[in-house]
């Protein structure tokens, strides 16, 4: 295959941008766009005040990446936040963007890649929203350099639980809310717009897949990369990996490049995670690299049959997306189709185990050993990360300067006779706590209330709740994430 150079930058970086005011080349938010935004804020505040006072507040969104399934709320109990989806402004010189809180990272990446820029951390799935990643969980292979998405937020405008719209930044009146907003999962308020930092990119990413038969050796390499930010003399812009099972581990190192001897493409018939075993190196466009996991929802498209070549050839390409699979899972959960099928076949019941957990690097080998012994689910995603700042975030129990590895595992495991649903999830939670780690709250949690608040800084949370939602208009974090209300 012929090589590719940076002269094709516009085509390689992706489609045209999606945004609110239509003229991305402007150097400031247009007055018309600002008027539309302010009108949308006023309308949302009125809508919020009109919601029934005794009903939980929920957002009317077309997609979700949460795995805490709840009954659908009545239409008159939801907030229409569609007006807050769009990129309001990109400033290439300052390397910043002003973005609606409901903007998906797919739209945001398309808007910024046009200028050779990207957000500092782009979570793995296209329909994750910027507001969702900042108030919840967001991590990716650039997290070894850039930490978590909320660390590159400059300021944000938030609709708080008491109905105010406030501007929160690192300094100023609402600095405490700014730092306490991450990991609050919409229980303190909703981000309506955010100003974020961007970083320059090159058109391609050169990836190298390095195999390890020993997890200790794999973690030794993680430590070396975290210390040096290089490997074999090359800079490490991205770092993640896969555990396929005991004795088979891979680290994938990504480095920006302005040339590509060849290009691989994993949005159609080819499957990215399978390529990790097949190739020692590869080249992708930067856009395709950002979404390499989305096409097959990492590897979770398997139950839908789309990894079968015969089915995949017939499956419309536009439906090879994580949000499509997530809707299929939600449909199955709503109507209990898989449960009915298992009962008719007299198959053993299965427990859904969908978690992302962060473990300190020095304890990762212990967690991996536990996981293969007790959970026995493969593959497992490995994503080394380190906070970008030297100051902790109050509701995010991660220490500055410390290297962690995010373990992502998503699937079902069989329940043995006498084991209740939640058995394996509770095992994971206990082991994570023992090893000094924490888990993301986007999926069902089983903690007791006292333990939960000990892990997630209940004192700081309750003080923020009293300051910004004294009437408890929004759900409590424990009620939302554990009780599933």
How would you name each of these model-derived features?
Residues 2-485:
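Noncatalytic alpha-helical scaffold of FAD-dependent oxidoreductases
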């Amino acid at each position: 295959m012929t090589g590719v150079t940076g002269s094709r930058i516009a085509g390689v970086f992706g489609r045209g941008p999606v945004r609110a005011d239509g003229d991305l080349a402007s150097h400031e938010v247009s007055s018309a766009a600002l008027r539309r935004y302010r009108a949308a804020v006023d309308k949302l505040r009125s809508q919020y005040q009109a919601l029934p006072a005794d009903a939980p507040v929920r957002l009317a969104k077309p997609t979700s990446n949460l795995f805490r399934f709840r009954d659908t709320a009545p239409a008159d109990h939801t907030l229409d936040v569609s007006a807050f989806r769009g990129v309001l402004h990109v400033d290439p010189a300052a390397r910043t963007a002003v973005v609606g809180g409901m903007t998906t990272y797919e739209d945001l990446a398309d808007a910024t890649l046009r200028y050779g820029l990207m957000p500092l951390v782009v979570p793995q799935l296209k329909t994750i929203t910027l507001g969702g990643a900042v108030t919840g969980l967001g991590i990716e292979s650039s997290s070894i350099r850039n930490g978590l998405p909320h660390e590159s937020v400059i300021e944000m405008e938030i609709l708080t639980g008491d109905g105010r719209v406030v501007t929160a930044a690192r300094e100023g009146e609402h600095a405490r809310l700014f730092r306490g907003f991450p990991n609050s999962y919409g229980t303190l308020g909703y981000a309506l717009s955010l100003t974020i930092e961007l970083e320059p990119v090159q058109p391609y990413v050169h990836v190298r897949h390095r195999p390890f038969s020993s997890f200790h050796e794999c973690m030794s390499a993680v430590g070396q990369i975290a210390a040096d930010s290089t490997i074999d003399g090359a800079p490490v812009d991205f770092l993640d990996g896969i555990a396929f099972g005991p004795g088979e581990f891979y680290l994938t190192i990504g480095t920006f490049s302005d040339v590509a001897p060849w290009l691989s493409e994993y949005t159609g018939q080819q499957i990215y995670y399978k390529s990790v075993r097949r190739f020692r190196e590869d080249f992708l466009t930067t856009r395709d690299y950002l979404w390499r996991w989305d096409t097959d929802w990492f590897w979770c498209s398997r139950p839908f049959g789309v990894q079968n070549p015969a089915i995949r050839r017939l499956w419309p390409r536009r439906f090879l997306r994580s949000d499509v699979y997530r809707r299929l899972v939600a449909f199955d959960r709503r109507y209990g189709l898989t449960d009915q099928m298992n009962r008719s076949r007299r198959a053993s019941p299965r427990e859904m185990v969908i978690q992302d957990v962060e473990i300190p690097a020095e304890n990762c080998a212990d967690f991996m050993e536990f996981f293969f012994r007790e959970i026995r689910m493969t593959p497992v995603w490995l994503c080394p990360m380190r906070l970008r700042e030297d100051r902790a975030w109050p509701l995010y129990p991660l220490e500055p300067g410390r290297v962690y590895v995010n373990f992502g595992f998503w699937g079902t495991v069989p329940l043995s006779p006498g084991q209740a649903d939640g058995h394996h999830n509770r095992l994971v939670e206990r082991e994570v706590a023992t090893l000094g780690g924490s888990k993301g709250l986007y999926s069902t949690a089983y903690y007791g209330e006292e333990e939960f608040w000990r892990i997630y800084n209940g004192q700081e949370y309750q003080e923020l709740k009293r300051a910004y939602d004294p009437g408890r208009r929004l759900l409590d974090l424990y009620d939302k994430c554990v009780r599933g209300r």
